[in-house]
From Swiss-Prot:
Catalytic activity: dUTP + H2O = dUMP + diphosphate + H(+)
Origin: domain of life: Bacteria
Pfam families xref list: dUTPase (PF00692)
Annotated pathway: Pyrimidine metabolism; dUMP biosynthesis; dUMP from dCTP (dUTP route): step 2/2
Gene giving rise to this polypeptide: dut
Transmembrane segments: none
Name under which the protein is recorded: Deoxyuridine 5'-triphosphate nucleotidohydrolase
NCBIfam families: dut, PRK00601.1
UniProt-listed Gene3D superfamilies: 2.70.40.10
Binding, substrate: R72, S73, G74, N85, T89, I90, D91
Keyword vocabulary terms for this entry: Hydrolase, Magnesium, Metal-binding, Nucleotide metabolism
GO biological process terms on file: dUMP biosynthetic process; dUTP catabolic process
Upper taxonomic lineage: Bacteria, Pseudomonadati, Pseudomonadota, Alphaproteobacteria, Hyphomicrobiales
Length: 160
């Protein structure tokens, strides 16, 4: 395992009493983010509704890294609630509050309580590219095939 990366974090007043994001197991890749909705209230996501849920946190991610907001698998499996723009990107130069865009794909309203774990934060390295315009590109076996062109039929099936 590599050396831990230091991330600056600032709690906003509406999230000051909540625990900081934390890894929930020794092998966890993501830090769990909590909902910083008003104390004593709940946020209800109706079926098909999307909402930006506050975390009460501002991050200082080092240059050459990003934060990725990803769904919690349990919320998706049990309630159909997921991060709509997964993975959401937090750029290293962003200094606003981290918000999690959740959507309820489930059939029932879903209530989010203050302090509930709503998403995972993954810190990842970023590779910046330099684009070079050209008149021709190297040929490949795949060519311009896309949208299912590399999928294989199951054994005994014929692709149509």
């Amino acid at each position: 395992m590599s050396e831990p990366l230091t991330i600056g974090i600032k709690r906003l007043p509406h999230g000051a009493d909540l625990p900081l994001p934390a890894y929930q197991s020794a092998g966890a890749a993501g830090l769990d983010l909590l909902a910083a909705i008003a104390p004593g209230s709940k946020l209800t996501l109706e079926p098909g509704e999307r909402r930006l849920v506050p975390t009460g946190l501002v991050l200082q991610i080092p240059p050459s890294h990003e934060g990725q907001l990803r769904p919690r698998s349990g919320l998706a499996l049990k309630a159909g609630v997921t991060v709509l723009n997964a993975p959401g990107t937090i750029d290293s130069d962003y200094r606003g509050e981290v918000g999690v865009l959740l959507i309820n794909f489930g059939a029932e309203p879903f209530e989010i309580a203050r302090g509930e774990r709503i998403a995972q934060l993954i810190i990842a390295p970023v590779t910046r590219a330099v684009l070079v315009e050209t008149d021709g590109l190297e040929a490949t076996a795949r060519g311009a095939g896309g949208f299912g062109s590399t999928g294989a039929a199951a054994i005994g099936e014929t692709r149509r």
